[in-house]
């Protein structure tokens, strides 16, 4: 009966203590709210009357007496300063009501073993902050979410304690975490927190932590000095010493086997929190189900204690020098504030939004994609089918493109591959190894009947308009230096590959620099783009010519040259000092043309062919940039003739014109010249080159540059 009376007295005392704690919390909240009202009244003078009107309506609706709001200027004039973290009054501990007083008949170990309340939440917060390696600033709400996540290392008992504390505070788990952070900052200084009002909401940020001080929040740090090895029980003298007979001991005489791993070190086989090891002794102050020292104990200097010692040795305790403190201070001053981080984040989001393609740009880019997927076939890295079968260990080579070695009677395989491969000018006498495409099937025709037929690679063409819309290829054999450019009309795109005089032996004639400067290129364009191929010393001369012709250089395309085996060329006959593996194409703009931007890249990787022949990838790329416009190529040869292009050069086969307007003007200027075909096809619509613009007015899939 006396024990029951004592227990009832303890419960009554606990209830009184809880009531007093709640009253303190209510009073503190009221003071805080009055401080907020006082700070807001400076911005909104009629704040208190408006609050009183609302409270009066609520009181009348609930049949309760109305108490006017006191004037906040009377006693809360300095309330905003009280909201700062270092001036904030300590909150009452509502978790004290969950701690029962030790009864005379209970042991301290059993009382300390019950987890819960503020102490358990402080431990959870400390563990979560220590797990942030490296540490990054975090707010209380995010910290609460990490504690409540399933991946958290907190046990169910600790999560229950967090929920109970949040319920006692009358808020969410974030309020319990805020209370724990304040207590840690006030008691040990393990965290540096700052509270601010953002968007009308209170936010608590953890800016920095002290790991050495946070370790004191862990229960194993508090119980470590109490760990003492259990005294060895006094055993009676063994009867085996007296005689040679082995007498089994009784269960009362059997000594418990000690652990193989000392208690002052973390277990050699760590387990999840909540699991215990049989034979491990209970440690006072550690909740049941929680193993002591699951984390290695770290002393004040951050040194892990080894062996059975309690702390680091004196020679390990190194005090921070003045230079280290200055570095820490400088690092703290250079840290971005929360507002600076928010501004940086906002700026990054704006940049991402600005550089993101618009819906129109995305639709235009989708229009130029190849229908039916990519039409490219990959080259096998093993080069030949024999090497492919040998490397893969199969009887059949892969379905990629392979080559076949050409072994002539004069070929010496010990010399290796020819540097020029299919561009070699002495294939009949060259002793190096050459290659050709291996088109022979790797599977006999009898067996290939059951397999799917190989996909045929078709020639690349514009998928967004028909060949009839592009028109037929046209060309004029002439001397560009004295040809009448004014009869050609206006063009949207011009591409030129001039025979620059680069002071080298070339298989074709060259033009002097002054002849290039005086070309009548300005008569060909008022609004459009020009693509000028340059090499060697002609790079600077090409830029000068663009400026003289009225263009502004805006881009530069690089052609990376590859050989027959799709490898970068390392040897060649160009370059005074280094072997040239690339060529440059200057891009100039005149006027305000209608073009598609950000469709293609400025790098082309293509195989070299005849001398001075440029990659065919240029023609579809220029059609994508300026679709359905007239296009002209200067210094062209017969392999440059493409649909929709007019070619000029002195190595073309006569004159071929299908545009009736252009034929009429050419015959008027050069009546003695023969034009093919004798009568142009009626299906081709004439294009009036006398118009003042180089684009059709109906084109709507481009944009004018700013």
UniProtKB/Swiss-Prot annotation:
InterPro entries: MT-A70-like (IPR007757), SAM-dependent_MTases_sf (IPR029063)
GO BP term, pick one: embryo development ending in seed dormancy
Function: Probable N6-methyltransferase that methylates adenosine residues of some mRNAs. N6-methyladenosine (m6A), which is present at internal sites of some mRNAs, may play a role in the efficiency of mRNA splicing, transport or translation.
Region (Positively charged region required for RNA-binding): 567-580
The protein's name in its UniProt record: Probable N(6)-adenosine-methyltransferase MT-A70-like
Any matching Pfam family: MT-A70
EC number: 2.1.1.348
PANTHER family reported in the protein's UniProt record: N6-ADENOSINE-METHYLTRANSFERASE, N6-ADENOSINE-METHYLTRANSFERASE MT-A70-LIKE
Keyword Transferase included in the entry's annotation: yes
Native species: Oryza sativa subsp. japonica (Rice)
One GO cellular component term: nuclear speck
Lineage start: Eukaryota, Viridiplantae, Streptophyta, Embryophyta, Tracheophyta
